[in-house]
A protein has these predicted regions:
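Long, contiguous internal "core" modules enriched in hydrophobic/ aromatic residues
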Residues: 2-180
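Substrate-binding/catalytic groove segments of enzymes
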Residues: 181-185
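Central hydrophobic cores of alpha-helical transmembrane segments
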Residues: 186-194
Length: 194
């Protein structure tokens, strides 16, 4: 947990540095704004790295807690699963948050750019669908490899099926269907489900 706290604290510092050019501009500090703007790319790279390490660190915590976790959810590949799931969860969150922001601030966007938001959402949906299918295939291979067939017909097994089918496979198909048929509403519902 100490490592995860460090990742989180450093990520918050990186996020503050990413946002600081706006504060410097608001305070009319032009030299500071230019300096902070030059730090942005390095800070974004640091932030992405820290968030990836944060997700793998959470997954590594599960490796140490094997006796306390049901065998359907425990795997030696849990850090990889955490990493892959964080990708599609992040894409889904961007779709959800972007939709809300677009509705609230659409009056501030020039009309010629309204359609570009839809294209961005379709691209994010395609990425989320691919990532969710990769995650599902990985989960299925681990399930088959670990020979956990006897655990499926239990109460915890039913919850596992709800998670894997209801919150991974169905949203993945919804993202793919929404991308293929250019349906923003289906993509938004899938983003909420994921």
């Amino acid at each position: 947990l100490f490592l995860i706290c460090w990742h989180f604290a450093l990520y918050m510092v990186a996020a503050f540095i990413e946002f600081s050019p706006v504060i410097a501009e608001w305070l009319n500090l032009e030299k500071a704004r230019r300096f902070l703007k030059n730090l942005t790319l390095a800070t974004v790279i640091l932030g992405v790295t820290l968030s990836l390490l944060h997700q793998s660190g959470l997954g590594a915590l599960f490796l140490m807690a094997k006796p306390k976790i049901h065998p359907l959810w425990w795997s030696q590949f849990t850090p990889v699963l955490f990493f892959v799931s964080s990708i599609y969860a992040g894409l889904s969150m961007i779709i959800f948050e972007g939709t809300l922001s677009h509705r609230v601030f659409s009056h501030m966007i020039p009309p010629k750019h309204h359609h570009s938001f839809d294209d961005i959402v379709f691209g994010l949906a395609k990425g989320a669908a691919i990532t969710m299918f990769v995650y599902y295939v990985f989960k299925a291979l681990l399930f088959i490899h670990d020979k956990q067939w006897g655990l499926i017909n239990t109460a915890w097994g039913y919850w596992y099926l709800v998670e894997v089918i209801g919150f991974v496979l169905i949203p993945a198909f919804m993202f793919a269907f929404g991308y293929r048929h250019r349906s923003l509403n289906i993509i938004r519902i899938a983003a909420i489900m994921a």
